[in-house]
Amino acid sequence: MQLDTSILQCPLTGEELHFVEGKELESIFQEKREIRNLSILKGLVNQSETYFYPIIDDIPLLLHDYAISTGRETDKLNNSKKKENVRVFNYYNEIDFERINNVERYNDAKKWLDSRDVAHSYISLSLLRAKKYLGKQGKYLLDIASGPIGSNEYLELSGNFDIRICIDISLNALHMARENMGSRKGIYICGDIKNIPLKTNICDSVLCQHTLFHVHKDEQENALDELHRTVKKNGKIVIVYSLFYHSLFMNITLFPIQVYRITRHLAGKLYSKIFKPKSHLYFYSHSLAWFKRWAGNDKKIEVYSWRSVNIYFLKLYIHKKLGGAFILKHLSNSEEKYPQVWGKIGEYPVIVVTK
């Protein structure tokens, strides 16, 4: 579908954006030969014509890394980025994909999802769980850091909305998302959760799954502020998060494994500081108390269960010959019956913020 520029804003200046191509594009870059020589046919420019963003395969690249200064003003592109953010950007732009059930997904999904038959129903129900909190209808659903929308369950999450706005730092993931969406209406934008290139109060609901903990710990609050800015009044922000060592249930049932995970996590941080890998998946989990401090008294925040156990629990305790399907059925029923309890003590809560 055709991109509606009226919903967009420049991620660097907050100004409106408009299309440029042909002679208008040449006039903007008349003093920059290195840009004129590139085969960029169209793009978006901000109101003051200080920054240009290319459009590739009908996907606007509204990301700091792809912004081009027109030279008309002192630019902001040299601001240093946290090395952790650079590594996450590289990770998701270098990762390969695999096709499962006619849907393209990241090939690292098997690290976090149990694909065994014994866990299939339990996993499938959890993947659909965010839908009940997103709202019954609306025009725009923002799927921030959408990735390739790598499961049929994820595709269903936007069923109550007219248009799914998929924003991700990976152009490859957006190509896969567009392919997976098929005939469903979608807008695909290369952008960052910390500087969402959408105007204020545009989206009816916002979906943020397994993303926030990959943002630097000091910038997660800013990312939350951006999610809150883009959603309409009374709109829902639905965040699927990992509590990691803040999960009481995982700490009790997986104590030795949790100690190992924490040790490995700390070792990974040390490795990154010493060897400085170009691509590395940053992770930091805040507590639920941190979210409540962010919300304060002016934001309504609720916590429910998305899935109470992680893949380590499933691989250790759940086996077909040992009644694994029976155990998971009762666990899933308990999550449905006591979502707020499991949301507070389980591995993966759904954090719902109402604006």
Walk through the language-model features, giving the residues of each.
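Conserved class I S-adenosyl-L-methionine
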Residues: 63-135, 151-154, 238-265
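Class I SAM-dependent methyltransferase SAM/SAH-binding core
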Residues: 142, 147-195
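A short acidic, Gly/Pro-enriched loop at the edge of an enzyme's catalytic core
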Residues: 194-206
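A short beta-strand submotif of the Rossmann-like class I SAM-dependent methyltransferase core
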Residues: 208-211
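A short glycine-rich, Lys/Arg-flanked "PGG" loop and its adjoining helix->strand segment in the class I
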Residues: 221-233
